[in-house]
Amino acid sequence: MRLAIDAMGGDHAPEEIIKGSLEALKHFHDIEIVLIGKEEVLRGLQGKEKRLKLVYASEVIENDEVPVTAVRKKKDSSMIVGLELLKKEEVDAFLSAGNTGALMAGALLTLGRIKGIDRPALAPILPTLNGATVLLDAGSNTNCDAQNLVQFAAMGHVYAQKMFGIERPRVGLFNIGVEEEKGNEVVKKAFEELKKSKLNFIGNVEGRDIPYGVCEVVVCDGFVGNAILKSMEGIASVISQLLKEELTRNIFTKLGALLIMGGLKRITKKMDYTEYGGAPLLGIKKPVIKAHGNSKAKAIFNAIKQAKNFVDNDVLNHIKEEIESMGDELSV
């Protein structure tokens, strides 16, 4: 398996991207990594690792650039070069921690959408009390219609099925209440269609339900999804900081912390977003993974692991089969 990685994308590029990639090569012996970036940055890696290939790109798409404009103007950027390698089937998946909008625009323009999907969705995995849940969309589409939400549900169903090993993942529709009549017209229409579908739809779910793991797939538009994602990241960070402050307050709290250190480490690990890798762009014709913009080596390593699992489990073809089998159910 060959994975292409944008060495120039993200807040901590290129150092942390390179570090995470080299760590992945040590751990996974059945992968090759193609690092894409500026020659002056990557040249020193030449010959360092047998399964590491280098592809030079003269440009970088920055986080503050207008996505579509940057994609069209910077044809030799590390991001677009990586997507072109994927299009030519020279690699099996592409991963970037760079500009999210540019990655989505570039993927759409370069690779295109799966037949039957109107809009691709960003689908991160969130930690929950009972395991994890897939959230989609997490920021790609701020305005969605009911048909988009039903399509997200179908893709999320397959993704959770393959990544979590659950035959009938529970699908919940994010809303301001669990009652069927709650929400705007788009959400109400999506509820009706999901209820008629073959998916394991459990109804509406509220924000407080998500951390408890009431379902394996949470469906919403990208505006709401991004707010959920960032809120959960912030809460996890605050809880971690509060625990650290309280457990180091004095000698007695420090002694108590020693007694529960094992449990604390497990909790911290479970709530750490870097453990969950990146978010696939579901609905794109080829495997594209978006790593968190703030990713350091550990997060990049886990995003590579996720990309590998995505390809190993043939998630993309299973999504295509699911979309085809649901047919008219996806047309609202």
Swiss-Prot record:
Broad enzyme group: transferase
Catalysed reaction equations from the record: a fatty acyl-[ACP] + phosphate = an acyl phosphate + holo-[ACP]
InterPro entries: FA_synthesis (IPR003664), Phospholipid_synth_PlsX-like (IPR012281)
Cellular compartment(s): Cytoplasm
Annotated GO CC locations: cytoplasm
Record-level Gene Ontology MF annotations: phosphate:acyl-[acyl carrier protein] acyltransferase activity
Keywords: Cytoplasm, Lipid biosynthesis, Lipid metabolism, Phospholipid biosynthesis, Phospholipid metabolism, Transferase
Highest taxon, organism lineage: Bacteria
Pathway named in the protein's UniProt entry: Lipid metabolism; phospholipid metabolism
GO biological process: fatty acid biosynthetic process; phospholipid biosynthetic process
Coiled-coil regions listed: none
Catalytic activity, EC: 2.3.1.274
Pfam families (alphabetical): FA_synthesis
Oligomer and partners: Homodimer. Probably interacts with PlsY.
Family: Belongs to the PlsX family.
NCBIfam families linked: plsX (TIGR00182)
HAMAP family: PlsX (MF_00019)
Protein purpose: Catalyzes the reversible formation of acyl-phosphate (acyl-PO(4)) from acyl-[acyl-carrier-protein] (acyl-ACP). This enzyme utilizes acyl-ACP as fatty acyl donor, but not acyl-CoA.
UniProt-recorded name of the protein: Phosphate acyltransferase
Species whose genome carries this gene: Thermoanaerobacter sp. (strain X514)
Gene from which the chain derives: plsX
